[in-house]
Regions:
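HEAT/HEAT-like alpha-solenoid repeats
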Residues: 30-34, 71-74, 112
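Leucine-rich, hydrophobic repeat-scaffold detector
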Residues: 16, 24, 42-47, 257-263, ...
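Inter-helical turn/loop elements of alpha-helical hairpins
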Residues: 1-41, 50-63, 91-105, 117, ...
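Helix-coil-helix junctions within alpha-helical repeat/solenoid scaffolds
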Residues: 105-320, 326-337
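Conserved, mostly hydrophobic/aromatic
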Residues: 77
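Active-site/ligand-binding-proximal alpha/beta "capping" segment
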Residues: 60-69, 73
């Protein structure tokens, strides 16, 4: 810890497993920042510390920190840090389950800001996130840099590129594409430890877990995918210890999917309901919708059609509340089929 600048690099202790310890260092760093009036690095301290704070405080409550970080960067003339805060803020805005139209508008503002200042390093991953938003809303348009072929994607953009492909394939139930992009995402991120430093890593872990249990139920290399799903589940369970608000519902949903895989249907029923209730309590409407949808597939599989329909209708209602009209259409087509 640098007492002169109030820098919070020691908050990285949280990434070694001591999240509470890292959180305490973050609070100390931010208090030093205020006390010493360190304007030059304020935006960086806020941006980096928010990555740790997000593992303790409700995710929705952390969104304002990125706005503060951006304002601090602009006050000191640091366009790079302003863009960095905007990029990470937009990502958290999506994962926090804010209304999709609002997230879309926020993304457009971020892209416009970066284009005007030629900040390309964060522009493209923001466009990848926008592509997910547009698909969910039900629009055919794509941000201009998203349509580029995989071979044209630079190395440092592959994490966001593969994840948006994986996410869209999973949400719209395209099994083969989901499996293929999950394999590419996992292969790339084995050697890309930098991505593990950001709170978005926890959401990557969550979706990889869901994908893994789905693939495990439907492929010959079941054991490998089951192990991946279990690894994700254990990670979410650990994070739920420091932030029940943000991670409990995700952990419960992975427990449900694992129980489904193992044929423990009674346990699966309990955990699906827990996942739905927790997501509702903690105001993650998009994950409440997802938990209902996956519960519907489960009940359909075990022959309880009426229960499946109930969960499908609730999933549709919650996706609509989120603004995911494209997903609503896809969901009804799937169950009609």
């Amino acid at each position: 810890m640098c007492l002169h600048w109030g820098l919070c690099n020691l908050a990285r202790i949280a990434k070694l497993g001591d999240i509470r310890g890292g959180y305490n260092y973050v609070k100390l760093a931010c208090s030093l920042l205020d006390k010493l009036e360190s304007r030059e690095c304020a935006s960086e301290v806020i941006c980096i510390s928010t990555q740790v704070v997000s593992y303790v405080e409700p995710l929705q409550a952390t969104l304002e920190y990125y706005d503060k970080g951006c304002a601090a960067a602009m006050a000191s003339g640091d366009i790079f840090q302003a863009s960095f805060n905007m990029f990470l803020g937009h990502t958290s805005h999506f994962f926090a389950g804010m209304k999709l139209q609002t997230t879309r508008e926020k993304g457009e503002e971020v892209i416009k800001f970066m284009n005007a200042r030629n900040v390309l390093i964060f522009n493209i991953p923001v466009q990848h996130m926008q592509n997910m938003v547009l698909h969910l809303i039900g629009l055919d348009e794509e941000p201009k840099d998203v349509s580029a072929g995989e071979e044209n994607i630079s190395e440092n953009m592959k994490t966001s590129y593969y994840f948006q492909k994986l996410y869209i394939s999973f949400i719209f139930r395209m099994f083969d594409d989901t499996k293929a992009y999950a394999e590419k995402f996992l292969a790339w991120n084995v050697s890309n430890t930098w991505v593990n430093l950001w709170v978005s890593y926890s959401f990557y872990t969550f979706y990889i877990g869901l994908v893994s249990f789905w693939v495990a139920r439907n492929s010959r290399d079941e054991e490998q995918w089951y192990e991946r799903g279990n690894k994700s589940k254990l990670a979410l369970r650990k994070w739920a210890e420091t932030s029940q608000w943000t991670f409990e519902n995700k952990w419960f949903l992975l427990e449900a999917e694992e129980a489904f895989c193992n044929g423990n249907f009674d346990d699966a029923k309990v955990y699906y309901e827990k996942a739905v209730t927790s997501a509702k309590t903690h105001k993650f409407v998009h994950e409440e919708a997802l938990a209902c949808e996956l519960a519907a597939y489960f009940y359909l599989e075990i022959g309880e059609a009426n229960k499946a329909v109930d969960y499908c209708l609730l999933a549709h209602e919650k996706y609509q509340e989120w603004g995911a009209i494209g997903k609503c259409t896809s969901l009804f087509k799937y169950f009609e089929g």
